[in-house]
Curated annotation (Swiss-Prot):
PROSITE patterns: AA_TRANSFER_CLASS_4
N6-(pyridoxal phosphate)lysine PTM sites in chain numbering: K221
Record-listed E.C. numbers: 2.6.1.42
UniProt keyword Transferase present: yes
Protein name: Branched-chain-amino-acid aminotransferase, cytosolic
Catalytic activity annotation: L-leucine + 2-oxoglutarate = 4-methyl-2-oxopentanoate + L-glutamate; L-isoleucine + 2-oxoglutarate = (S)-3-methyl-2-oxopentanoate + L-glutamate; L-valine + 2-oxoglutarate = 3-methyl-2-oxobutanoate + L-glutamate
Tissue-wise expression: Expressed in muscles.
The protein's assembly and partners: Homodimer.
Gene: BCAT1
GO MF, one example: L-leucine-2-oxoglutarate transaminase activity
GO biological process: L-leucine biosynthetic process; L-valine biosynthetic process; lipid metabolic process
GO CC annotation terms, alphabetical: cytoplasm; mitochondrion
Places the protein is found: Cytoplasm
Length: 385
């Protein structure tokens, strides 16, 4: 890899030029309002990620000048050189968080600092420039305030926030980019799955496909992790399943579910009531909902909570011995999603999630959405407007 261009942490411009700006600041925001505002959709008709608000946030960066002033402007197409590194070598990353209109009509963000932390880590892994996480979050809040009427007046819908960071240097060399663009777009959304917000999903598990591997970027939110998963997702659908259960290694370790983290609520091998999820070992995305569920379960203190490896043999044995209570995915888009079946080695494994309530998954969903929609006060939220 050619790392001669821009790999120094102390890049400077041409001799005699001023020092590059190390970060953008929210106080420098330049806001240009849209002159024509679009009609707001009925929240009950929303299809995930297909409708966008009136405005967007953009911030440009170059090695020579550093960060330019952040701008909020009418939503518009990007103008990129066809040689931009994001288009050829996937020098990019994204984030996903939501704004919720509470029962008190206040607009809240849910644990956005965790998203900013993860975005920063992804940027470092992608060799994209550093930024001030607090300043970016403040810029995002200003964008949400401007488009606050797009936050659905509904407790079954929300405003999805998509920060994105891409390399824009017009060069076909495989190297760290000397130009980049950070932008944020907003989209009002309903349930992520067409089956509904809390209907169980079926999974397809086949070890011939791998989502991530040790030493890779599976713990970063990069588009390449998702684009490369689509072929397996299509095969899952062909096998009448809704999502892929990603396996890893010779022991077929259970890792993630589609775009979600995975939880298993069961009686473990030692006869203990346990909520288990795979550990953050570099192939698991450190999800905000994952962390929130672990935090809640630890606080409740009612059963063992573990970050541990789980294999398909562990699961099939537990199902045969009637030790599995619930299995569910978690993520910003879906919050909590029950699992009903797994197609593995041409056999369907029935997971009794719905037969068991699902008491725990329902309790977690209720607790998290109570916080998100302001039915319960919590320091996990930031009030925007």
């Amino acid at each position: 890899m050619d790392c001669n261009n821009g790999c120094s942490a102390e890049g400077t411009g041409e001799g005699g030029s001023k020092e590059p700006v190390e970060t953008f600041k929210a106080e420098d925001l330049i806001i240009t309002r849209a002159t024509i505002l679009k009609e707001k959709p009925d929240p009950s008709t929303l299809v995930f990620g297909t409708v966008f608000t009136d405005h967007m946030l953009t911030v440009e960066w170059s090695l020579e000048l550093g960060w330019e002033k952040p701008r909020i402007k009418p939503l518009q197409n990007l103008s990129l050189h066809p040689g931009s590194s994001a288009l050829h070598y996937a020098v990019e990353l994204f984030e996903g968080l939501k704004a919720f209109r509470g029962v008190d009509n206040k607009i809240r963000l849910f644990r956005p600092n965790l998203n900013m932390d993860r975005m920063y880590r992804s940027a470092m892994r992608a060799t994209l420039p550093a930024f001030d996480k607090k300043e970016l979050l403040e810029c995002i809040q200003q964008l949400v305030k401007l488009d606050e009427e797009w936050v659905p007046y509904s407790t079954s819908a929300s405003l999805y926030i998509r920060p994105t960071f891409i390399g824009t240097e017009p060069s076909l060399g495989v190297k760290k980019p000397t130009k980049a663009l950070l932008f944020v777009i907003l989209s009002p959304v309903g349930p992520y799955f067409s089956s509904g917000s809390f209907n169980p999903v079926s999974l397809w598990a086949n070890p011939k496909y791998v989502r991530a591997w040790k030493g890779g970027t599976g713990d970063c939110k990069m588009g390449g992790n998702y684009g490369s998963s689509l072929f397996a997702q299509c095969e899952a659908v062909e096998n009448a399943c809704q999502q892929v259960l990603w396996l890893y290694g010779e022991e077929n370790q259970i890792t993630e579910v589609g775009t979600m983290n995975l939880f298993l609520y069961w009686i473990n091998e030692d006869g203990e009531e346990e909520l288990a999820t795979p550990p953050l070992d570099g192939i698991i995305l450190p999800g905000v909902m994952r962390q929130s569920i672990l935090d809640l379960a630890h606080k409740w203190g009612e059963f063992k909570v573990s970050e541990r490896y789980l294999t398909m043999d562990d699961l099939t044995t537990a199902v045969e011995e009637n030790r599995v209570r619930e299995m569910f995915g978690s993520g910003t888009a879906c919050v909590v999603c029950p699992v009903s079946t797994i197609l593995y080695k041409d056999e369907t494994i029935h997971i009794p999630t719905m037969e068991n309530g699902p008491k725990l998954a329902s309790r977690i969903l209720e607790k998290l959405t109570d916080i998100q929609y302001g039915r319960e006060e919590s320091d996990w939220t930031i009030t925007v407007a």
